[in-house]
Amino acid sequence: MLSPDQIHQYDEQGYVIPDYRLSDDTIEEIKIAHKRLIAKSPQFSDYCGALLIEDLSFLNYARDQNILDMVSQLIGPDIALWNSSFFAKPAKIGTRTPWHQDGEYWPITPLATCTVWIALDNTTINNGCLKFLPGSHKGKRLESHHLNNSDDIALPLSLIHI
């Protein structure tokens, strides 16, 4: 569960790093499922935008009760999984994703949603971790995705083995 401080951070900054982590076994299961997906459909080696259409086994990870409990703390109890994607971004050689706002691509109005990002490997600034602009969720939606990087922050994460 998220603490009141973590919920406040999400409301103000647009992100939170929960203490909860999937187990090593679960992370390994996801990696194996991804390898199986690529073996069946090599075109998804970098990105699969409709993951559950291709492999329903990934739904098990979206149903993780601890994750659902945290999401419900942020957006309420009426949760609908409307998309699940897999981005494979090997360190330094993975396909770059340019700056964007997810909401520009999502068919949801009002934009009462959130994303759960599950890193399967350690991420660092040097190998290309997730970056975001804190608080940008509170402003008006951007029409253009050309941004100045001066206010961004990086989100390096180390996997915690449990």
Indicate where each model-derived feature is located.
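Conserved hydrophobic/aromatic beta-strand scaffold that supports enzyme active sites
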Residues: Y15-I17, T115-A119, C129
